[in-house]
């Protein structure tokens, strides 16, 4: 798996590496999809009601960086949960993007905290300009 260097934390997931066919000849190209991947991107666009869908050639890090750059160019505010991916934090620092953090509620379970949709809705409604939410 690109980005994971063929390693997975759980031994049960080791078999999943055999399912990564993106690098096999004839399986289409993530960089310039024209076959099955292009068809899948078109289907995803239809499913999510978007004009276009493009699968990432650079994994989740590239997708996160792209989303944040687009939001910054549009002057939109970024709201985020506190348990974000490291790539999100790094991109915010590099792009000089301030983040409005949504803090978790205390949990008595095994998780250190939980999030409630109402907290995100309230934060969005308080915005004067459209915002994006990273969860």
Tell where the protein language model's regions lie, with residue ranges.
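N-terminal glycine-rich, Lys/His-bearing helix-loop that initiates the first secondary-structure elements
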Residues: 1-17
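Conserved N-terminal alpha-helix of the aminotransferase class I/II PLP-enzyme fold
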Residues: 14-62, 83
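Short beta-strands and strand-loop turn motifs
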Residues: 24-25, 101-103, 130-135
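Conserved beta-loop-alpha segment that forms the PLP phosphate-binding cup at the N-terminus of a helix
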Residues: 52-77, 86-91
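Short, structured coil segments at secondary-structure junctions
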Residues: 95-97
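Active-site phosphate-binding strand-loop segment of PLP-dependent enzymes
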Residues: 110-135
């Amino acid at each position: 798996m690109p980005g994971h260097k063929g390693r997975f934390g759980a031994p049960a997931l080791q078999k999943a590496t055999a399912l990564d066919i993106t690098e096999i000849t004839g399986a289409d190209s993530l960089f310039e999809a024209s076959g099955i991947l292009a068809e899948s991107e078109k289907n995803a666009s239809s499913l999510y009601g978007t004009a276009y869908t493009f699968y990432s050639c650079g994994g989740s890090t590239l997708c996160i960086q792209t989303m944040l750059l687009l939001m910054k160019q549009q002057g939109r505010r970024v709201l985020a949960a506190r348990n974000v991916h490291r790539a999100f934090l790094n991109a915010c620092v590099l792009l000089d993007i301030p983040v409005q953090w949504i803090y978790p509620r205390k949990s008595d379970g095994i998780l250190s905290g939980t999030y409630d949709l109402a907290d995100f809705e309230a934060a969005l409604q308080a915005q004067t300009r459209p915002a994006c939410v990273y969860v």
